[in-house]
Amino acid sequence: MIGSLLKKIFGTKNDREIKALTKEVEKINALESEYEKLSDEDLKNKTNIFKERLKNGETLDDILVEAFATVREASKRVLGLRHYDVQLIGGMVLHQGKITEMKTGEGKTLVATCPVYLNALAGHGVHVITVNDYLAKRDRDQMSRLYGFLGLSSGVILNGLPTDQRKKSYNSDITYGTNSEFGFDYLRDNMVSSLDQKVQRELNFCIVDEVDSILIDEARTPLIISGAAEDKIKWYQISFQVVSMLNRSYETEKIKNIKEKKAMNIPDEKWGDYEVDEKSRVIVFTEKGVKRVEEILKIDNLYAPEYVELTHFLNQALKAKELFKRDRDYLVRDNGEVVIIDEFTGRAMEGRRYSDGLHQAIEAKEGVKIASENQTLATITLQNYFRMYKKLSGMTGTAETEATEFMHTYGLEVVVIPTNLPVIRKDDADLVYKTKKEKINSIIDRIQGLYEKGQPVLVGTISIKSSEELSELLKKRKIPHNVLNAKYHAKEAEIVAQAGRYKAVTIATNMAGRGTDIMLGGNPEFMALAEVDSRDDENFPEVFAKYQEQCANEKEQVLALGGLFILGTERHESRRIDNQLRGRSGRQGDPGESEFYLSLEDDLMRLFGSERVMIWMDRLKLPEGEPITHRMINSAIEKAQKKIEARNFGIRKNLLEFDDVMNKQRTAIYESRNEALAIDNLKDRILGMLQRNITEKVYEKFAPEMREDWDIDGLNEYLKDFYVYEERDDKAYLRSTKEEYIERIYNALVEQYNNKEAELGSDLMRKLEKHILFDVVDNRWRGHLKSLDALRESIYLRAYGQRDPVTEYKLISSQIFEEMIATIQEQATSFLFKVVVNTEPVKDEKNEIEADGLCPCGSGKPYEKCCGR
C-alpha cells in the first residue's frame, strides 16, 4: 500500500527514466531545423567529425544528441522515415545497455539505427541479432542504405556463408545475424590452429531483436559442435543381450539397508541379478549379478579398469530395460525412429535424443537401427555467450513479465517505452468450453462470421498440428485462408504482411511471423515486389503507387469493421506469448480486438484448476456449446501461467549454475589457447610444462620421508616411457635433495630437447610444438566435456545424500579440470620427446604424377596443391 502511494506521488522508476530521456529528445528535436539545412556532403561528414572527437577524448554520451539528430535526418533523406520521439527514447535505452519494450508496429528496426550508428563510431563493431536468417538479411538490406550514406559498412552472417565472407562481415562496422551463427562462430574460432582462421573480432556491443525469444525461450538449449565418436554400436547390442538374460531382484530391493540384508542371510535363490530404485531412478548390480555377467562375457573382473566403458554400456542397457517404457517415455515410429515423449505435455519431441548413450541403448532394446553416438567438441549456453559482450541490450514487444529473469541472468533492466499513439484495441474476456469439440465448433463459427463480415482475422494456435486441424475444417466450409508455420521464414513474412487485408483469414502458430508488421489493408511494398523483381526496377515506383492507393482504400474498409481480430485457440504456458499474439493487433493507434477460446481439455486447463471451473459449469447447468466467462477464470489461468513460468525459470537458472562452472574452465582453456596462437615460439612454454611435470612426478615418487623408501625404479621407468630418458648414475638420487634431483633431470631433458631441435631444425621444431600442443589440448578438452556430461548425469543422485548437486559438481569438476591440465602438460611434452619425423627427401616424380592425383608425400592432398606447387 505504501509503495502504491509513493508511486502516485513520485511516479514509477520507469516513468522517471522516460521523463529524463524526454529532456534529451528535446535537445535532438532542437537540432532538427539546423540539420535539415545541411547538404548531403555536410551531413555525411558528420561521421568523420564524430570519429575525430572520440579520438580526442570525448565519449559516446558526449556526442549522443548530435549523432541521433544526424541519423534521424539521414533516415528522412534515404529511407523516407522520420524517427518518432518515442523511437529516439527507445534508442537511448538500447545505448545504455538495457532492454526496451516497445509494442508491435512501433518500428523497432528503425529504433536500433541510432544506437547502432553511435556505437559503431568507436570502431569496435556492433552486432545486431535477429531470430532467423530471413530477418537478418532483410534488416541489413534495408538499413545498409542508411549506414552506407553515413559512411559505415555493414555485413550479414548467414548459414552456410564461406569463411572469407564471414570474416569480411565481422570486420564491418555493423554485423547482422542470428544468435546461433554468432555463437557457433565463437566456438569454431576457439578450435582453429592459426589466428588468420578466426572470423570474429572482440564482442563489443550487441542489440538483440526479439530479446525474450532469444535470451529466454532458446536459453535452455546450449550450442553444441559435435563430431562422430568411435563406433560402438556392437557394444550396445551385446550389452542389451546380456541384460536380457538377467533377472531383477524384487525381493531384496524392498530392504533398503545393506547391513540388514547381510544379517538376514537371504537365500541365494531370492537374490536377483540387479536391484532397481525407481524413485531415484538408479539400478545396481548384486554380487550374484556381477558374477553372472562375468560368466556370460567370459571375463575375470567386471570392475577392472579396462572394463569401465563396458560397465557404462551395461548400466545404460539396464536403464533402457527397466526405467524407460515404450509409449510412456518414448515411441517408435514405423521407420524405426525412437522419439522421446515430453513428460509434461505428452508430445513427441522431434529431433531430441537422450544423452550419454541411453538413446542407443533404447534403440538396441527395440531392435531398430542404432544411430552412431556423437562426441561434443565444443559447447556454450546462450546465456554465457551473450554475457561476454562488453555491452548488451535488446528490444521486444513483451519483456516486462520476464524482467526478474533478465536482471538475474544478464543484469539487464527493462524499460517500457510509451506507444507513439494510444492503444485502443479491445481485449475480451476468455471463453471457456467444457470440451475441445465444443470449442473448435465455436471457433469455426466465429471465423466464418468474421469472414462473411469482411473483418480480417488472425487465428493463433500453439502447435502446427492444431493449425492443420483448423485448416481442414475451414476447407470444408469453403473459407479461403492461409496457414503459417515457422518453416519458411521468407514466405511467412509475405503472408503475415497481408493478414490485415479485407476478408483475410490467417492461421499461425503463436511464434510465427514475428518481425513483420500486419498493416491494415495490406502492405503495398510486398504486393509491388510480387509483381516486379526489386526496388531498383524502373517500374517499381509506378507499381508501388498503384498498390499504395489500393491498400489505402482497403484500410478504410477494415477500420470501419473494427480492425484486425485476434482469435487465440488456446492459452500458452507463458503470458508473454499470449501478449505477443494480442500485440499483432492495434498497431499505431489502429482499432482491433482479441479473444481467447479455451476448453477444460486444453493442457493448461487440464493441469491447473479445471476442477473448479467444472464445478461452476455444473452449477450453472450450461447447455452444450455454451461457454463461461468470468474474471475468476482469467485470474486462475494467470496463476497457472505464473507457476509454469517460475518452473521454467528454475530450469534455466539451474542450467546456468552448472554451465557457469564449465564456463570458467572454458574461458581459461580458450584464453591460454589464444595466447599460444599469438606466439610464434612456444619453446619456453613447453619447457615450463616439462619442469612442472617433472617436479610433480619426483614429489610423487619421492613422497616418503625416508630416502631408502623413495621409488627410484618407478621414476626411472616413467622417465624412460615418457621422455626416452635413462639415468646413467643410479646412485645420484642418494646424493641429492629432491630439488637438486629435479634440476638434474630437467637440465638433462632440456639438453636432450635441444639436441632434437638441432637435428630437426628450429623451424620444424616450432611447428611441431604448436601442432602437438593444440592437438593435445583439443583432445583432452573434448574428453573433459564428456566427463562433465557424465558427471552431470550422475550428480543428482548426491542430492539424496543431503548434498547439494551444484556444490558437488563444482568440487568434482574442479578436480577433473586439474587432472586434465596435468595430463595436457604430460602428454604434450612426452609426444615432443618421442616424435619421429621422416626427413628423407621425396623423389622427384613430377613427370609421372597426374596434376589431380594424390601427392606421394602421404599428406592425402592433391599433388598440385602440395609438393607440386
UniProtKB/Swiss-Prot annotation:
Matching Gene3D superfamilies: Helical scaffold and wing domains of SecA, P-loop containing nucleotide triphosphate hydrolases, SecA, preprotein cross-linking domain
Cofactor(s) this protein cannot do without: Zn(2+)
Entry superkingdom: Bacteria
Pfam families, alphabetized: P-loop_SecA, SEC-C, SecA_DEAD, SecA_PP_bind, SecA_SW
Keywords attached to this entry: ATP-binding, Cell inner membrane, Cell membrane, Cytoplasm, Membrane, Metal-binding, Nucleotide-binding, Protein transport, Translocase, Translocation, Transport, Zinc
One GO MF term attached to the UniProt entry: ATP binding
GO biological process, one term: protein targeting
GO cellular component: cell envelope Sec protein transport complex; cytoplasm; plasma membrane
Entry function: Part of the Sec protein translocase complex. Interacts with the SecYEG preprotein conducting channel. Has a central role in coupling the hydrolysis of ATP to the transfer of proteins into and across the cell membrane, serving as an ATP-driven molecular motor driving the stepwise translocation of polypeptide chains across the membrane.
Name recorded for this polypeptide: Protein translocase subunit SecA
Organism: Fusobacterium nucleatum subsp. nucleatum (strain ATCC 25586 / DSM 15643 / BCRC 10681 / CIP 101130 / JCM 8532 / KCTC 2640 / LMG 13131 / VPI 4355)
Lineage of origin: Bacteria, Fusobacteriati, Fusobacteriota, Fusobacteriia, Fusobacteriales
Name of the gene encoding the protein in the UniProt record: secA
